[in-house]
Amino acid sequence: MLAAMIRTLCAAVLAAACSISMSAAASAPTPQPVSTPGTDCAAITGPPPQSVPPTSVNTLRQAYLCVLEHYYSGPVMDSRALLKSALAAYTQDLIRRGADRADLRLPALTGNRDTDWAAFAKVLGTGDPAALRAAITGMVAGLHDNHARWVRPTPPPQGGPVGTGIAGVSAQQGPQFDPAARPPLFITKVLAGSPAAKADIRPGDIMVKVNGVPAFIGDSVNHNIIDLFAADPVRLTLKRPTTGRTRTVEIRQGPITRQPPKVTSKTLPGGAVYVQLPGFYEGAADQVIAKLQGRPEAVVLDLRGNGGGSPREVTRLLGAFAHGKVTSYFCPLKGECVPNRTDDSVRLLGSRLVVLTDRACASACDDFSAAVKGNGLGTLVGTRTAGAVSGPGEGYLLDDGSVLILPKVRHLGPAREIIDTIGVPVDHYAPMTALDLATGRDPGLAKALTLL
């Protein structure tokens, strides 16, 4: 789960793998009546209207003022930086389309947000809708905030969802790649019956190239291949780790079946219960607790690939393992931080806890992992979490039906430490490799069993 890049990756690799993108909005209030776009951005309370005007200069104005009014640091932000980011993206879009304008320059700005906007709007004139969309994307990207998003809802495709069926890759962190990713890049999940499955693409297959472009340049992941996933067909050069065989496969998007996220569980040797939680979606905590109603002596909670969700689900699930604990803080720009606490209405399980994490454990998953480690509630096994937890986002409706998602507060861990961009380190390092996936091994679970 939002911006153009998110939709690009989700369309090709499947939206189910993009839950980190959606977690920015997961903590917003439960939708009530539908919002109506007006002259200013308004807090969204339901699905955007289906019939809306195109993106205009006024839409960009709304986004600009919305950031200054509602974003965490908006009230003290230099508005000139926003306009600079917006025009940079606007002109780059024009250049890519061979439509640059000789008269298009950033006017002299004073730092007064109203007079600067008036000068900026005069330069734009009526504006180019595609370039205006790029400008909003660029302005939001300039915040460098993993929970700030601009979303343009698109109607579902006729005939149901389509994609390749590749539902995850090893370096993926929501709409982008982990900047700390190490080679190789490999597939982690393939949907049954999908075009990828029919092409005999399997978990563990190493992506050497995408449309002829290498997945890694030296030891650095090539972020440019993200956009290449949207090609239809897409050409993948794959290496099977069990045999070393390399082949090139061309895949066209086709019908896929999206299963809603669900909690799964099994009993491990020795009596411990393994529970896999794919996201902190509404009701997820109670689903996990229901799987543990037998009050097992030990629990292995698998949060690998968990892209986040609602902070309320985090505190509720933590309440099954401890009471009276501060789990995190939400801090405004000015004023006191507000502590989040375990939901002590939940009955304690009294179980030992091992949590499996990876670099795709993000947002609310970062939050949960930090609370477990910071409060000594259990042991973390796997790899460091994503560190994508700037703060919960709230949605604001713009006049073209798009939604701006902005955090109003900053997240801190239970000791008031910053988790965002850093992540939560594990107690025992046990990464999943391509060969592990291809052969059905699970080093994280194996390590958890030794601890229990």
What are these regions (language model features)?
Residues 1-10:
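Bacterial N-terminal signal peptides that target proteins for export
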Residues 9-21:
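Bacterial N-terminal signal peptides
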Residues 28-85, 91-103:
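Cationic-aromatic interfacial patches
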Residues 51-52, 186-189, 197, 202, ...:
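Cleft-lining beta-strand/loop regions that shape enzyme active-site pockets
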Residues 64-73, 87-99, 117-128, 135-148, ...:
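Sec-exported extracytoplasmic/periplasmic mature domains
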Residues 70-83, 97-106, 126-132, 146-155, ...:
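Surface-exposed patches in mature extracellular/periplasmic domains of secreted proteins
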Residues 138-189:
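PDZ/PDZ-like peptide-tail recognition elements
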Residues 195, 206-209, 233, 403:
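Residue-level marker of beta-strand positions
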